Every structure is written in C-alpha cells, then in structure tokens.
Amino acid sequence: MDVLVGCSTGINKIYNIHKKTPTGLYGALNTTSELNVMTFGWNSVENNEDYVFYGYSNGILKYWNQKEKQLIGEIDYGQSIKAIHPLNNDKLLVALENGLVDVKTLTAPITTQLAPMNLPTLNKKKSPAAAAAASTVGKNNKSKQVIVEPVNTQSFSLNVATNLSGFAMNPSNDKFAFGGKDVNLTIWDLEKQVKTYSAKFKHDFLNLQEPVSINVVKYMNDDKILIGSDFRIKAYDLRSKTNRSSFLDVSFSKHPIQSIQYTNQKEHYFYASDSIGKVFCYDVRTSRQVGSFKDSAGSVKDIAIHPTLPLLATVGLDRHLRVYNLDNRKMLHKIFLKQRLSCVLFSKEEPTNEIAQEEEEIWKNLEENKNRINNDDNDDNNEGNDKKKSISIKVTDNMDSDDDIEDGDDNDVEFPMEADSDDSDFDLGNSDDDNISVKKENKGDSDDSDDDSDEDEKPKRKTPAKSNLRNNNNNNNKGKNNKGKNNSSTKKTSQVLKKKFAGLKKRK
C-alpha cells in the first residue's frame, strides 16, 4: 500500500509502507514556493490515483502522472492556491487566497499544457489576479502567452470573499464551504451560484464579538461541518434554519489548528492537529478528548485517513511520515524522508495476498533459522560433554627377576581413569567405573614355594597396593584442577608402586 507525500520544496515521494521501501520520486526542487494542497485526479478516470494535482503558494497548479513520473500540465493563477477539487462532469474547481473560486469544465482529455481560459465570469468586477492570469502565464511577463481554448473549455469564477484560508467541498460535490481571516463560515451552492448558509459566532462572557479566524474547514457529511480556528474547533448543524450557532465548541489548543480529518469508519470522532505537533481525537457526542497520537515534533501540516483501513498518517516540519492505528492510537511506521513535508495522501489499495504470503514466508524462515541455530548449539554442548579420555596404568611384575621394576612394555602400571578432552588431568576417583586392577605375571619356575606360602603371599601383595592406590586417588582428586600437580602425583604413584613391589619380591 502506497502513501504519497508532498514536500514543501516541490519534490514528491511515494512510499510503500508494507515493503518499507520508497517506490517513486518525481518533481523539481523549488525553494521559492511551498506546497499548499495535494489531491488525486478525477474519479471518472480509470486509475485516478495515478494522476495528482499539486497547488503551490506562488499560484502554480501542476497536474502529474505519478505512475510514469510525467508532468501533464500546469496553470499559473497568480495567487496562493488554497484548494483543488476535481468535480463531476470533468470540472475542476480551484480556490485562491484572494477569495476567487475558479471552475473549469474540460471537454477534452488533458494531454497538453493547461492554461486559464479568457472567458466571461459571473462577477461584475473581475479581480486583478484573474485579469492577470487571463493575459499571461507567469509573473513579470517572462512566460509565454496564454492559449485560449473556448471550444474545449467552459469556465466561470466566483469572488466569494477575501483572505480565504479554509475551503471544503461537501460529499455530494454540489456545495462548498469556506472561511478565513474575518470571514465567518459561509456555504455556497455551486450549481445555483448563491449563498445558502452563514454561521454565527457566539459572543464571549463580556458580550463581545469573538474574533473570526478560520484556518481549516472539513465536512463530516452533507449536514454537519467542522471548522478549526486559531485555538478552537466548532461544529455546525446545517439542517437548522434558525440556529446558526455551533453545537460543538471545544478548546483544542493554545496554538493554531493545522488540519482536521473525519472518517466514516468512526462516525462519532474527528482528528485534528496543531502547530506544535499535537494530534488529538475528539468525540462529537461528549465534546471530550478521547486520546492523542504521540511522538510528533513540530507543526503537523497534514493528516490523512485510509478510506477503508483504520490507518492515520501525519506529516510535518520534522520531516517524518508517521502511520498510526486508529483503534489503539499506536504508531505503526515512522519514516524519515529528508525534506520538510506539507501534504500526504493514502492510496485506496489494500495489502494483497501476495504481500501477506511474503511476510509469512519471511517470518517462517526466520523461525526456522533460529531453531536450527539453537539445535546446533545444543549438539555442540553435548559433544563437548561426551568427549573424554580413558587413561590407564598397568602394573606387572616379573617374580623371577631380582632386579627392580623397570619401565617397559612388561612392567606397566594401569589405572582406568576418565578425563576431559580439553586437558590431561588424571582422575583417580573411586567411582564404580574407575576400577583399579593390579596384575602380577609370573615368569619362570618356582619349585621352592609351597601352597601355604602362595596363599599367604596373595593377600600381602594386594592389600598394600590397594590401600596406597586409594590414598593416591584422594590426593589426585584434590589436585585435579592443577595439571602440574596431577602429573607429579602420577609420577609419585608409580615410584611408590615400584618400591612396594620391590619389597614384596625381597620378602618372598
């Protein structure tokens, strides 16, 4: 799902919030003007979201094909543009700051440069800006002459007020409302071209007229409308013919209101922002604040709500695009877009099944990789615990020899032991698996010995060996963590065994 963002310097960006990647960049850098308004093209055109209107403070209106990144046409109105509304029957309405409302009917496809038409208006007095726009396109007579196309275009203008700030069309596109500095809320019928409603501000507690300064106008439906002044938000019921006062009057902020949005998804709530970064949600029924959207810094210039999904997007001077959930008011996305941002639009498309499947596959792969890494770590730990050495010392004695026991293949000392694979420590513990065996191998004849002597000699040979081995086992267990001590204790054990068996041989 794409979000269109308009920068105040003339650069326009498209960002896909599900793929989290920018998908488009077009426009030209222009620091002499700021972007005031941005809207999609005519609904009657196929793929109308591919076409976008941009209105700037220097009076330039541009019509872009954002899919092909191509500028279709532009108009110089000479005054700051406050509103752009593509109407039914190929009409285009543009409201200017000086109170001029220009309506054009385009009977041919817009494939060339647009230009203001030099046609008679319904006003008795033609505004200087309209006269200037009818003669040339641009300022200081440096741009080319206007191309007049009376055959393909019909136009009329309404000079409704001066110092116009807020402007809105009703959902039926047959009436428009506006307000501004010292201009109270007024509604005109576009077809009849007459004023149908004028609001009235209540006097304050001193019975003085409240200053009128309307910045934003927003229709809730054909019968109810919201306005945002410098410090307050008011709501009016247009069905009442006698009571022109507001039925809702809330003190929103101590700073000017920048934007107001309403959605049919939550018909009893509206959303508003001010010039210091506050974004609030209000309940129309109770006139109370429901909650706020956090993390904004600086002026929040524009708010957009998705037509079908519970998503709210904000842009402002802190150069971040933020997307919130309308239900719990939690921030879902925060994207830094480098330029100062003025306007934002949600595309109507919703996330496709392909995108959802891609996200599921990504999460599934991440889980599989995590499980694989954990299994590998467990296998490594088990292998490290299973790796052990078996060290043995074998003791043999040649009873026929009168010499001392010598080291060799026939005179070995064997002790079954276990040690870790990482070191060569000897474990002479007295566990069931650590059996100590002392073997004696007799070589040669012994005719002088008898049965009694043999029976007496056997226990005498085994007893001292076992006792000494157990003592040595205890000593070795105490010094197991020291490799040098274990090696020295093993040498001492072999020397003691040699001496003991040498004594046994002499006694025999």
UniProtKB/Swiss-Prot annotation:
GO terms for cellular component: nucleolus; preribosome, large subunit precursor. Residues 399-435, 447-456 have a biased composition (Acidic residues). Residues 471-493 have a biased composition (Low complexity). Residues 436-446 have a biased composition (Basic and acidic residues). Residues 497-508 have a biased composition (Basic residues). WD repeats lie at residues 32-74, 159-198, 252-292, 295-334. Keywords: Repeat, WD repeat. This is WD repeat-containing protein DDB_G0290555. It comes from Dictyostelium discoideum. The lineage of its organism: Eukaryota, Amoebozoa, Evosea, Eumycetozoa, Dictyostelia.
